[in-house]
Swiss-Prot record:
Consists of three domains; the N-terminal catalytic domain, the editing domain and the C-terminal C-Ala domain. The editing domain removes incorrectly charged amino acids, while the C-Ala domain, along with tRNA(Ala), serves as a bridge to cooperatively bring together the editing and aminoacylation centers thus stimulating deacylation of misacylated tRNAs. This is Alanine--tRNA ligase. One of its GO terms (molecular function) is aminoacyl-tRNA deacylase activity. It catalyses: tRNA(Ala) + L-alanine + ATP = L-alanyl-tRNA(Ala) + AMP + diphosphate. The lineage of its organism: Bacteria, Pseudomonadati, Pseudomonadota, Betaproteobacteria, Nitrosomonadales. One of its GO terms (cellular component) is cytosol. Catalyzes the attachment of alanine to tRNA(Ala) in a two-step reaction: alanine is first activated by ATP to form Ala-AMP and then transferred to the acceptor end of tRNA(Ala). Also edits incorrectly charged Ser-tRNA(Ala) and Gly-tRNA(Ala) via its editing domain. It comes from Nitrosomonas europaea (strain ATCC 19718 / CIP 103999 / KCTC 2705 / NBRC 14298). The gene is alaS. Its EC number is 6.1.1.7.
């Protein structure tokens, strides 16, 4: 039975028993930055189990894609070398939220395994928690399992908990017996770590809530969470012992062999590559891009490990990206999002391959040299150098060292890392301002509804210290009980404006959160005096706020437009929105084409002209996501979120300030598109009057160019192209004339060659020639003089260019590189090259005649 058939059969089995099929959630957990990746089927139901979310169903079934690489689940070094370690796997699971409990969970599992899949009863074992008599009774008296194949286990292996506190409960695990040909004892025995008895399904019965004291309290509605690895059950159904022998992996291993040129399908490197393409492709599909921290670094580690194993198989060219199509063939039908993202995924992988290829070979040479010393430990300094200079993740170096029976000095590596961090801190140009201590009430924000509000001063800070009052010209931070000022957040700059009281005027230059919920108004007291307890009128700069709103609303339209034009892989990676401009960073692995930029710009302007009402609404995070709201990648949101929608074109979670109608933005212009990091692009744009002024300035510059060309603006590009063609033609003619002139000069100059110990030596200048002509003349002299040493010089714009040549018969004693350095030093320069030809430059043209005159004596001394 194929893996795809098992997956489908599982979903249909539970759907027929009242379960709702829930699609796999992304590998990046929504609204939970504390969890690196989705690593189990229950992750997307976590809030349901905790009672913080309700679903319109009480039974669910899913096939969840999971990644375990990084943190406590980091088994990367084992992947490819054992039968069941993977970075990516699929978890089949059925769930009950306060509906059925132990009895049906066990009976469903037994029916599916023995009925739907036809696994012989005698091949299955079960374990229960030692104190779980209820589960044991169901197995023995309702399922009818042989008592010799039911094991009570008292360890934590059979008691599951989400954390130190919260929902928890006993487990019942189902094992498959691969037979006596495989070593290992039954679960709970001394030899249980062997591979004969393999866990295939874990049934978790959440029936308690553990409090802070550790005491267990029965849950009013017990729930069920189960998980069965698709790869493991496929191995059982296909009667193979290793997951890498199932149909899904066989096709990927064959593809890996094809693109690497490997003939041995049992090679562990092919298993590594086959495993890693699944993890990498799905991580990229779900918005992760290779980087140097967090999820991006885990992806980079997996990618580079796969690349290194290809290198180990002799493949020095990019190959890993070629496997994306093979993966789509195998898994695309079950996960259409992979099919949609195939081009983007392949592009990101290829870019990372090319990036790593620049340093891989040199890094391997350094590592091979270090490993060849015969030491049992690889020094931390070498590990750090490979990491810092050549981009080798530490576990990649450890992987290679382990193949030689060598361990790495992690303590030494950590010492080097700490020293680097200390150096970085010492050389930093800026230091973070010390946080202001504040223990009062939070600031109440009114800025969505008004730009002016009465408030009371709660705290004043001057030079980082709390004070009771401030006077004229004092720079300070003011904390108010209420404010219309927006504090910098989500990429939007803080508001500016003024605070007015009967005794003074405070100019607010910026607004920042000094801690959660507390707004600091930064600026200077322009006149008078202010003290804690004073009443003030807080007034936001209306023009700046309005222009900022134009730009912020435009970023939402831009984000949606980019996803339409470039694809759904585009996600926001950063933004800056202030009164003058907007800057938007997004995931995309190549520079945008000019037509794509225009498409995006036109799409945004079309939405502006539609004059959508900009609607804001407060709702739960889950409701917002269900309505299609875009959330920032990796951001943590509260229980209630603010949703900003512009028609059906853009819906995002956002706490910023916006226009009332999209038409208020007026006009949108993209002024720049660039790369800021691998896989991250940046767009800079203008809106409203600023966009209009930019456009008018461009038109004015075009008119000036057209006037200079004596052409109409619409004909300027064609006229300029003609002029450039003429210039290129004239440059060719000049080069031809220079070459002819050099030929004439060379005929007369060749007679100046001196003979030293049977060798012809010529050192002279050429006038009005470029470097290309200089080289051609050098070759001409060498061909005509046969056994010779030639040095030629020319002067252009007060700079000296030198070239030296030595015929092959003389390079054992006379090196062109040594000669050119000798001459170049005399004219204030330096150079280098091969033994037969070298080039240099200089800054002292007046010294050139004397330098060339010294060549014969140098030749004589070095013969």
């Amino acid at each position: 039975m194929k893996s795809s058939e098992i997956r489908q059969k599982f979903l249909e089995f539970f759907e027929a028993r009242g379960h709702v099929i829930v699609p796999s959630s992304p590998l990046v957990p929504g609204n939970d930055p504390t969890l690196l990746f989705t690593n189990a089927g229950m992750v997307q139901f976590k809030d349901v189990f905790l009672g913080q979310d309700k679903r319109p169903y009480v039974r669910a079934v899913s096939s969840q894609r999971c990644v375990r690489a990084g943190g406590k689940h980091n088994d990367l070094e084992n992947v490819g070398y054992t039968a069941r370690h993977h970075t990516f796997f699929e978890m089949l699971g059925n769930f009950s939220f306060g509906d059925y409990f132990k009895r049906k969970a066990i009976l469903f599992a037994w029916e599916f395994l023995t009925g739907s899949l036809g696994i012989p009863r005698e091949k299955l074992w079960a374990t229960v928690y030692a104190e779980d008599d209820e589960a044991a009774d169901i197995w023995l008296n309702e399922v009818g399992i042989d008592p010799s194949r039911l094991v009570r286990i008292a360890t934590s292996d059979n008691f599951w908990q989400m954390g130190d506190t919260g929902p928890c409960g006993p487990c019942s695990e189902i094992f498959y017996d691969h037979g006596p040909a495989v070593a290992g004892g039954p679960p709970g025995s001394e030899n249980a770590e062997g591979d004969r008895y393999i866990e295939i399904w874990n049934l978790v019965f959440m029936q308690y809530n553990r409090d802070a004291s550790g005491e267990l309290h029965p849950l009013p509605k017990p729930s069920v969470d189960t998980g069965m690895g698709l790869e493991r059950i496929a191995a059982v159904m296909q009667q193979v012992h290793s997951n890498y022998e199932i149909d899904l992996f066989r096709s990927l291993i064959e593809a890996a062999a094809r693109v690497t040129g490997s003939k041995d399908l049992s090679n562990n490197s092919l298993k590594v590559i086959a495993d890693h393409i699944r993890a990498c492709a799905f991580l990229i599909t779900d918005g992760v891009i290779p980087g140097n921290e967090g999820r991006g670094y885990v992806l980079r580690r997996i990618l580079r490990r796969a690349i290194r194993h290809g290198y180990r198989l002799g493949q020095k060219q990019p190959f890993f990206y070629l496997l994306v199509d093979d993966l789509v063939d195998v898994m695309g039908p079950a996960y259409p999002e992979l099919t949609r993202a195939r081009k983007h995924v392949a592009g990101v992988i290829r870019q990372e391959e090319e990036r790593f290829a620049e340093t891989l070979e040199n890094g391997m040479e350094v590592l091979e040299a270090a490993l060849s010393h015969g030491n049992e430990t690889l020094s931390g300094e070498i590990v750090f150098r490979l990491y810092d200079t050549f981009g080798f993740p530490v576990d990649l170096t450890a992987d290679i060292a382990r193949e030689r029976g060598i361990v790495i000095d992690m303590a030494g590596f950590e010492t080097c890392m700490a020293q680097q961090r200390d150096r970085a801190r010492a050389s930093g140009k800026f230091t973070m301002q010390t946080g202001l201590e504040y223990t009062g009430q939070p600031t109440e924000f009114h800025g969505y509804a008004t730009l002016q509000h009465e408030a009371q001063i709660l705290a004043l800070y001057k030079q980082g210290s709390r004070v009771d009052f401030i006077e004229a010209d004092d720079e300070a931070v003011v904390v108010l009980d209420q404010t219309p000022f927006y504090a910098e957040s989500g990429g939007q700059a803080g508001d500016s404006g003024e605070l007015l009281s009967g005794s003074g005027t405070f100019t607010v230059n910026d607004t920042q959160k000094i801690q959660a919920g507390v707004f600091g108004h930064n600026g200077m007291l322009s006149s008078g005096r202010m003290a804690i307890g004073d009443r003030v009128i807080a007034r936001v700069d209306q023009i700046a706020r309005t222009n900022t709103a134009y730009n912020h609303s435009a970023t939402h339209l831009l984000h949606a437009a980019l996803r339409q034009v470039l694809g759904n892989h585009v996600t926001q990676k950063g933004s800056l929105v202030d009164a003058s401009r907007l800057r938007f960073d997004f995931s995309h692995n190549s520079a945008m084409q000019e037509n794509e930029i225009r498409q995006v710009e036109n799409l945004v302007n079309a939405q502006i002209r539609k004059n959508h009402e900009v609607a804001t609404q407060l709702m739960t995070y889950d409701d917002a996501v269900k309505q299609g709201a875009m959330a920032l990648f990796g951001e943590k949101y509260g229980d209630t979120v603010r949703v900003v929608a512009m028609g059906d074109f853009s819906t995002e979670l956002c706490g910023g300030t916006h226009v009332s109608y999209s038409g208020d933005i007026g006009f949108f212009r993209i002024v720049a598109e660039s790369g800021v990091a691998a896989g991250i692009r940046r767009i800079e744009a203008l809106t409203g009057d600023a966009a209009l002024a930019y456009t008018q300035q461009q038109e004015q510059q075009l008119q000036q160019v057209a006037d200079a060309l004596k052409a109409a603006p619409q004909e300027a590009a064609q006229k300029l192209s003609q002029i450039l063609d003429n210039i290129r033609q004239m440059e060719k003619e000049i080069a031809t004339l220079r070459s002819k002139l050099a030929g004439v000069q060379s005929t007369s100059l060749i007679e100046q060659a001196q003979e030293i110990k049977g060798i012809r030596v010529l050192a002279t200048t050429l006038e009005n020639v470029n470097v290309k002509t200089l080289r051609e003349t050098l070759d001409n002299f060498k061909n005509r003089l046969k056994s010779c040493v030639v040095v030629l010089g020319t002067i252009e714009k007060d700079k000296v260019t030198l070239i030296a040549g030595v015929t092959d018969d003389l390079t054992v004693k006379l090196k062109a590189g040594d000669l050119i350095n000798f001459v170049a030093q005399q004219v204030g320069g330096k150079g280098g090259g091969r033994a037969d030809m070298a080039q240099a430059g200089g800054t002292l043209p007046e010294k050139l005649p004397q330098a060339l005159a010294s060549v014969p004596s140098w030749v004589e001394q070095n013969l």
